Regions:
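Sec-dependent N-terminal signal peptides
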Residues: 3-12
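Proline/serine/threonine-rich low-complexity linkers at boundaries of modular beta-sandwich domains
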Residues: 13-17, 205-216
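Solvent-exposed helix-loop boundary motif
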Residues: 23-30, 58-103, 108, 112-117, ...
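Short solvent-exposed capping/turn motifs at the termini of beta-strands
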Residues: 39-43, 238-242
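Short, well-ordered beta-strand segments
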Residues: 46-59, 195-203, 246, 250-260, ...
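Periplasmic/extracellular electron-transfer cofactor-ligation site
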Residues: 116-138, 198, 202-210, 467-482, ...
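Primarily short, surface-exposed interaction patches in extracytoplasmic proteins
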Residues: 307-668, 699-700, 704, 724-792, ...
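Globin-like tetrapyrrole-binding proteins
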Residues: 796
Length: 810
């Protein structure tokens, strides 16, 4: 009898080991470099640094300890450092130079980072606006020159004692040799103590033009997918203007964007706590970077489940790649009713009417969704809706503009949306224009922001997604922007002039020939320069706005396109790839960086076409997914494996109630039938809109529009005059039912199609038909029975309009 052997196919992944950084140069006797022994097997990485066996081919050139820290030996040269772990090995070459050269710690590059790491110059300590106990440092060491003067020349020289460094207050207090309100921060046996002590012993050398300046940071690993519960060491290396590099890991400030997924300690050791992704943010010497660390969800998903996902465009490809890495399975595609309602709301801010729904549900053509999207993007309501959105962004209201200026600004925005003006042209039309605000509505942007500081901060947040306000007073604590960059940027707008026009309420915008804004500490103007760009001479007669507009709309300025792409994505998908949608700082990375980069690239390559961007997103399967969770994605509200439910905005909700009931909302001073989304001004009184979060348009901040639930909202919905009056309106839809003599079944179909974009279920229909049938049994006159029937219909419509299915976009 033959023996049968069954072979089970199991995916085998060859484990690979690498040493990071892949190349190392040690410069000077104090150079150190933490190495990582990092393995890769399949989709996962693993940190073997603490258990690996480390060896050097020549310890006299460079030695490596059991922790993987390599340091110079007795002479210069090259050496091979090897790590062995789990039966495999990896080797890198380390170059050593100036191993025995004289060395002095730098105040800028060593002492200041030590003070920052210890928290001495934090906002809670001596970096506070008023300092602590008469000792004030600049926040996180943003101005080393000022800090040097404070340490060495103030307090009668007691903070730094050149005669006996150990008696320096800067050592005595943080080491707790004498009482210190901040506690023990600086153990005497620490490297940090030695850095400060040896710097003082060397004569406390000041800052010098010969000091190497930091040019950038590298992080290792830049990204890693780890197993649940795993740990990972992060290593940060700084590069300097003289070409040398330094391991600055121990002086970096670390934080995690999602501590439910991963936490990080003071020394860069990451611990995985849950499933998903976390950005480990690194702050060092006014520079920020992050490492993306992830752990997949604990789901076993077969490959065919991903293969069945219908990919329509690059959005689906990149979303699918993210889900695979995180072990998330997408929800199915939403049914036609859900998609139809969602598309109408997201593209045009309205509900489909009952005829729209019936026609769409009856349509059997395979491309009906694509055709619907195309039709929606050509409707007047699309123009109303997106004009309203951009008016929110640009703060159009009579709060700060007169009525004429408000209307001309709004009409300019609406005309731009109607003609699908490219976004780069939209920006140029604002920043490059001069003349009368009556004749050119875009110029009212400068009337709104007459103050140079306000104009600078609004422009950077509206068009670049950068909140630079902190840098007005000091280097940004959470971003790379410095105070110097802030005032260089502000000086681009210092010569924007505003004067009265020839007609009442008119203003004229012009470029002044002179005028600068002063750096508050330096007490002098700085050469104007966009963020991270070259400056222009202070004495140049060129309109500085030209330089700004050219830089702003350049395809190489990724912040510009990235910001508006993320805003549009957030509007359609309920959450930005970067969230909040207007906070695109480096320490707030996208949930799918590859997808955002691809959207930005596609947007730029197709001429900054907003309508095309919306069409691209809405045509993706990703946009059309159901919001109903499956067994893998119930907890996902970040990676779009299911559609994210959102409450209707105040204006959309009010207009939808008016649409379903056939009773338009009256707005004082506006023609009958004006919808909330057609109002150019948020100062138009409406308690309902105010209660549901209509923004006052004071600040350029996505948080101005609130979606938080309140008691006031509940009262408006449950028993408010706004809805009750619409239900009982004598010329509304419910009154029309009686006049037309529609059957109960047809009435139910109509109200469900109008409110929910679907037919009632059998259970809903049976319950409501029974309720309507009871009205026929009311004793008394025919009029009493008609009144009872009308009241029953009002109650049914009220029940539909106060239900979550109506109040939310699914």
């Amino acid at each position: 009898m033959k023996h049968l052997v069954f072979l089970i196919a199991v995916p085998l992944f060859a484990q690979k080991l690498a040493v990071l950084p892949p190349s190392v140069e040690l410069t000077g006797p104090e150079a150190r470099q933490q190495l990582l022994a990092q393995s890769t097997s399949g989709d996962f990485q693993e940190d073997w640094t603490r258990t690996a066996q480390w060896s050097s081919s020549d310890p006299k050139i460079a030695a490596v300890d059991e922790h993987g820290i390599v340091h110079p030996g007795e002479r210069d040269g090259e050496v091979r450092i090897t790590a062995k772990a789990n039966g495999i090995a990896a080797t890198i070459t380390v170059k050593v130079q100036n191993a025995r050269a004289p060395f002095t710690w730098s105040f800028r590059n060593h002492v200041t980072p030590v003070l920052t790491k210890m928290g001495c110059n934090s906002g809670a300590c001596h970096g506070a606006l008023a300092g602590k106990n008469g000792f004030k440092l600049t926040l996180r060491g943003y101005d080393p020159e000022v800090d040097y003067d404070t340490l060495t020349r103030q307090a009668q020289g007691r903070r730094v004692s050149l005669a006996d460094p150990t008696q320096s207050l800067v050592l005595l207090k943080p080491s707790f040799a004498i009482p210190h309100g901040g506690g023990k921060r600086l153990p005497k046996d620490s490297l940090e103590y030695r850095v400060i002590a040896e710097w003082i012993a060397a004569g406390a050398p000041p800052l010098s033009n010969k000091d190497a300046e930091i040019r950038g940071l590298e992080v290792f690993p830049a990204a890693a997918a780890l197993k649940p519960g795993a740990e990972q060491q992060i290593v940060v290396r700084a590069s300097y203007s003289d070409g040398h590099t330094e391991d600055v890991t121990r002086w970096v400030k670390f934080s995690s964007s999602n501590e439910g997924v991963a936490t990080v300690d003071d020394w860069g050791r990451v611990k995985m706590n849950g499933s998903g992704e976390a950005a480990i943010t690194l702050y060092y010497s006014s520079r920020v970077l992050y490492s993306r660390i992830s752990t997949p969800f604990p789901h076993q998903i077969t490959s065919d489940r991903y293969e069945k996902y219908p990919r329509k465009n690059f959005i689906d490809d990149l979303a699918l790649a993210k889900w695979k890495g995180l072990h998330l399975a997408p929800s199915p595609v939403a049914d036609d009713s859900t998609f139809l309602r969602r598309a109408f709301i997201d593209a045009a801010g309205i509900l489909p009417n009952s005829e729209d729904v019936e026609n769409f549900l009856a349509d059997r053509s395979p491309d009906k969704r694509t055709k619907l999207i195309d039709r929606l993007l050509e409707r007047d309501e699309y123009v109303d809706y997106w004009s309203y959105k951009w008016s929110d962004l640009f703060l159009v209201s009579t709060r700060r503009l007169n009525s004429t200026a408000m209307w001309t600004f709004y009409n300019w925005i609406r005309h731009s949306v109607a003609q699908n003006k490219p976004w780069d042209q939209f920006a140029r039309d604002i920043f490059l224009s001069s003349g009368s605000t009556r004749q050119n509505g875009a110029l009212n942007y400068f009337v709104l922001h007459k103050d140079t500081i306000e104009l600078t901060e609004n422009a950077t947040q509206a068009f670049l997604g950068q909140r630079i306000t902190c840098a007005r007073c000091h280097n940004h604590p959470l971003e790379k922007w410095t105070q110097t960059q802030y005032y260089q940027m502000a000086n681009l707008f210092a010569r924007v002039g505003v004067k009265n026009g020839n007609e009442p309420g008119d203003n004229v915008i012009f470029a002044k020939a002179s005028g600068d804004i002063l750096h508050p500490r330096l007490a002098r103007p700085l050469a104007p320069a966009p963020l991270d760009a070259a400056s222009i001479p202070l004495d140049s007669l060129e309109d500085r706005r030209v330089k700004f507009a050219e830089w702003l709309t350049s395809p190489t300025n990724h912040m510009f396109a990235r910001t508006v792409v993320n805003r549009v994505w957030a509007s359609l998908m309920s959450r930005g790839l970067v969230d909040p949608a207007d906070d695109l700082r480096a320490t707030n990375p996208a949930s799918n960086e590859e997808l955002l980069a691809a959207l930005e690239k596609d947007f730029v390559e197709h001429g900054y076409d907003i309508r095309r961007l919306i069409r691209t997103i809405m045509n993706s399967t990703l946009y059309q997914l159901s919001s109903a969770p499956n067994e893998t994605n119930a907890a996902d509200d970040v990676y779009y494996s299911k559609h994210i439910i959102k409450r209707l905005s105040a204006e959309v909700m009010l207009d939808a109630m008016a649409q379903v009931t056939g009773s338009p909302t009256a707005f004082g001073g506006y023609p009958a039938g004006t919808r909330a989304l057609q109002l150019p001004d948020t100062q138009v009184k409406s308690d309902f809109l105010a209660s549901f979060g209509r923004p006052p348009r004071i600040l350029c901040d996505a948080a101005e529009r609130s979606s938080d639930p309140t008691i006031s909202q509940a009262l408006h919905v449950i028993n408010g005059d706004t809805l009750n009056k619409k239900l009982s309106a004598p010329d509304g839809t419910i009154a029309l039912f009686s006049k037309l003599g529609l059957s109960d079944r047809r009435i139910l179909d109509h109200i469900f199609l109008s409110a929910y974009s679907r037919y009632p279920t059998d259970a809903e229909r049976d319950t409501m038909l029974a309720a309507l049938e009871k009205t026929r049994l009311v004793k008394g006159t025919d009029e009493a029975r008609r009144d009872a029937r009308r009241q029953a219909i009002e109650d049914m419509v009220w029940a539909l309009l106060t239900n979550k299915e109506f109040l939310f976009n699914h």
